[in-house]
Amino acid sequence: MAQQRALPQSKETLLQSYNKRLKDDIKSIMDNFTEIIKTAKIEDETQVSRATQGEQDNYEMHVRAANIVRAGESLMKLVSDLKQFLILNDFPSVNEAIDQRNQQLRALQEECDRKLITLRDEVSIDLYELEEEYYSSSSSLCEANDLPLCEAYWRLDLDADSADGLSAPLLASPETGAGPLQSAAPVHSHGGGPGPTEHT
């Protein structure tokens, strides 16, 4: 722990005044309370009448009770002054509190980072296993070279399109064959007509 630096003269004087106020107020409370206890004790007969003595004791108790209240208020004011002094002048304690808070936050950040890294690794492993299971279950759709699933579906679509293209000409072949037969029909219809003339 670093050695505490010496306070400036003004601060040292202020602390001494606070210490003196504390001692004076405590002494005032103790003295007045002791005198109130003494006044409450019944004394022997004196030259002063009991009524007069009673009024005097009552007045003295009120005064000493007021002194106790004043000393208590002074102590409360002293506590407030000490808090203000510590807030405004106790920079080492403030810096230490800030450092402790920073260390706590750093430790929390490191813990969160470790948990996130662990979660990332677990998710990566699970995702890899799911991908392997998915591609192995769809291996029947792939070729021998183990194409990706999207390319396998793409090739299946191409095969289906080519099959449709081959079946269409087969169905249309009778219609195409009717053309030459219809074109040959006029030849037979003119069979009774004169034949072509020969040129010499």
From Swiss-Prot:
This entry carries the following GO cellular component terms, namely: core mediator complex; mediator complex; nucleoplasm; nucleus
Q: Which GO terms describe its molecular function?
A: transcription coregulator activity
**Region Disordered: what ranges?**
169-200
* Subcellular localization: Nucleus
Q: Which UniProt keywords apply?
A: Activator, Coiled coil, Nucleus, Transcription, Transcription regulation
According to its UniProt record, where is this protein mainly located? Answer: nucleus
Bilayer-spanning residue ranges: none
Q: Name one Pfam family in it.
A: Med22
Biased composition annotated in UniProt, kind: Gly residues: 190-200
UniProt KW Coiled coil keyword: yes
GO BP annotations of the record are: positive regulation of transcription elongation by RNA polymerase II; positive regulation of transcription initiation by RNA polymerase II; RNA polymerase II preinitiation complex assembly
| Coiled-coil regions listed in the entry | 93-122
Q: What does this protein do?
A: Component of the Mediator complex, a coactivator involved in the regulated transcription of nearly all RNA polymerase II-dependent genes. Mediator functions as a bridge to convey information from gene-specific regulatory proteins to the basal RNA polymerase II transcription machinery. Mediator is recruited to promoters by direct interactions with regulatory proteins and serves as a scaffold for the assembly of a functional preinitiation complex with RNA polymerase II and the general transcription factors.
Tell me its family. Belongs to the Mediator complex subunit 22 family.
Q: How does it assemble?
A: Component of the Mediator complex, which is composed of MED1, MED4, MED6, MED7, MED8, MED9, MED10, MED11, MED12, MED13, MED13L, MED14, MED15, MED16, MED17, MED18, MED19, MED20, MED21, MED22, MED23, MED24, MED25, MED26, MED27, MED29, MED30, MED31, CCNC, CDK8 and CDC2L6/CDK11. The MED12, MED13, CCNC and CDK8 subunits form a distinct module termed the CDK8 module. Mediator containing the CDK8 module is less active than Mediator lacking this module in supporting transcriptional activation.
Task: Report what the protein is called.
Answer: Mediator of RNA polymerase II transcription subunit 22
